[in-house]
Each structure stands twice: as structure tokens, then as C-alpha cells.
């Protein structure tokens, strides 16, 4: 696998970019998660960043990448509506793993947004998408720009939802390389990694949550529900960060 030219790839149409990365992805599929991280750090350009929602399995990718690249900026987009347990989990993992946490927020406070737009999450798909654009997408775009990111690590897994089922290890999103080291992990592999390294699930895991985002758009799992139905009232799975 040769060193990839980000600028040249960004000049290509999306379909051609996918084709240009196909051979590299075929090789990365054969590597384990640690090998993928090491390959990316050796072959892809910096600056490097890692994003995390500090959700149910967040400790895995935070530990995996941070142990190889200590002090890598960890981007959190904070909506102001996270669960209290999530904020506590953020503090706990930041201290335990000595994370270089970078918190980004919308330019408008949560209260100001409600005054201007009402409760966007109660306004159907269009409202949810506007909410996500304001609170997730714009802050992430700003983070990538301010941190001069060229390679972005994230902890997505194909098993999590249909929208992630066919994601490759390596892609280009928002003009930067995006690397998904644990994309092919199942729940058992996640559990084993957490156990091996003395790490915990998000505190709400024990209360029946399979996925955790904002308080107003997250539901406990109930028998018969798919994991993606626990977020955004089942109207959509992605918050916008990992789309486009």
C-alpha cells in the first residue's frame, strides 16, 4: 500500500475516489485494528484527530488510538443536552486515559436555539437535521479546520446499523482521510477489548441503553427494537457527523 495523496484524491469525483481507495481498503480489511491505526499514522498525513461521542463503547477507540498516538486531539461536539452520566463518563475517561480533549459547541447556546427555533427535535426529520447541522456538523467542520486535520479516526462499526453496514476502513469525508479501525468488530470483540484493558461501558449501558446521544432523542432498548430505533425516534440513525 503506497502513500496516498489527499489533495489529488479530493480532486476526483466521489465514485472515482472510492475506486482509487479500493486496493488500499482490501489490504486494510486483512489487518487488525491496531495494524490499521499504525498504518494510518505511517502512511496518511497529519495532523491527526480522533472524534468521540463518549457513547456506550467509546472507551475502545479512545484507548486503542491514544495508546499508539498519545496526545492526539479528541474532538467532542457537545450539544448541551447530553446525559449527566455522559458528562461524568467524559471526565472519567479523560482522566484515566489522559486524553487531549477538544470540546466544540454550536455558536448559539442551547437556550438561544430553543428561543429562536423552538425544540427542533420535535419538528420531524427536517427539524432533527437542522438541529444536527447546528450542533454537530458545523462544530465538527470547525474543529477539523482549526486543528488542521488531514486524518480523522472514528469508532464506527458496521454492526451498529444498516447505514454503517458497508462502510470501508478508509474513506475521504469533509476533505480529510477518515479511518475506522474497529469497523468490522462485533459486540463480543468490543466486550473482550474492554475486559482486557480494564475499561468500562458508558454508565447507561447497565440501564438498558444500546446507544446514547442527547437526552431528548435517546430511548432505552426494548425487545423487538433495532439499535437504530433507539435514536431520533427511529426517524434516522446518523446525527450528520458521519454522513456526506
UniProtKB/Swiss-Prot annotation:
Its EC number is 1.8.4.8. This is Phosphoadenosine 5'-phosphosulfate reductase. It is found in: Cytoplasm. GO terms for cellular component: cytoplasm. Keywords: Cytoplasm, Oxidoreductase. Pathway: Sulfur metabolism; hydrogen sulfide biosynthesis; sulfite from sulfate: step 3/3. It comes from the Bacteria. Belongs to the PAPS reductase family. CysH subfamily. GO terms for molecular function: phosphoadenylyl-sulfate reductase (thioredoxin) activity. The keyword Cytoplasm applies. HAMAP family: CysH. The active site is at 239 (nucleophile). Catalyzes the formation of sulfite from phosphoadenosine 5'-phosphosulfate (PAPS) using thioredoxin as an electron donor. The keyword Oxidoreductase applies. One of its GO terms (biological process) is hydrogen sulfide biosynthetic process. It catalyses: [thioredoxin]-disulfide + sulfite + adenosine 3',5'-bisphosphate + 2 H(+) = [thioredoxin]-dithiol + 3'-phosphoadenylyl sulfate. Its main location: cytoplasm. SUPFAM superfamilies: Adenine nucleotide alpha hydrolases-like. The lineage of its organism: Bacteria, Pseudomonadati, Pseudomonadota, Gammaproteobacteria, Enterobacterales. It comes from Citrobacter koseri (strain ATCC BAA-895 / CDC 4225-83 / SGSC4696).
